[in-house]
Amino acid sequence: MSTKANKYCLDANVLIQAWQKYYNPKFCADYWEILTELGKIGKIFIPELVYEEIIRTDDDLSKWLKGSKIPINKISEPVTVHIRKILENYPLLVDNTKARSLADPWVIAHALHENATIVTKEEKVTALNSNKIKIPNVCDNMGIRWINDFQFIDELDIKFQCSLT
């Protein structure tokens, strides 16, 4: 049985960190072209709140995202039903005092609604005394598949071309 997903829901950190660090379009334009193609065929999507989080900053990533073909999933009634359950059971997922992780429950809710695999840079919190909870913790508890961006690249057999200029 294949573990390959039909759809992938991207967390904001997958795009932000890739743009700022290891897949900067100056030296890895292929990554962004592939994401655009995956968006066109409906293989990937981002929740509306992830989109808003990224375009809030007027930078090159936000400009790219606005012009990309990655579908932006809007908030719907079924998604809000999932949100209520997530926030009831995992109130520490969102840090309201610092306005952090505000899109995280929406990433999970949209993935649930679409039966999609979440792609995130977050890692499980395993410390027993931690007052934080991350997307992978909630996913594991709710039976939602999640992977990091390197697993995503491997799973879709994405290849990059390199050359000297």
What are these regions (language model features)?
Residues 1-46, 53-66:
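Short, well-structured N-terminal submotif of metal-dependent ribonuclease cores
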Residues 1-7, 16-18, 77, 81, ...:
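Noncatalytic, typically N-terminal accessory segments of nucleic acid-processing enzymes
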Residues 2-4, 28, 124-165:
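Acidic, PIN/NYN-like endoribonuclease modules and their adjacent C-terminal/linker elements
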Residues 22, 51-52, 122-127:
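Short histidine/acidic/glycine/proline-rich micro-motifs that form metal-
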Residues 45-48, 139:
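Short internal beta-strands
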Residues 48-101:
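PIN-domain endoribonuclease scaffold, especially VapC-family toxins
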Residues 99-119, 131-134, 138:
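Acidic, metal-associated active-site segment
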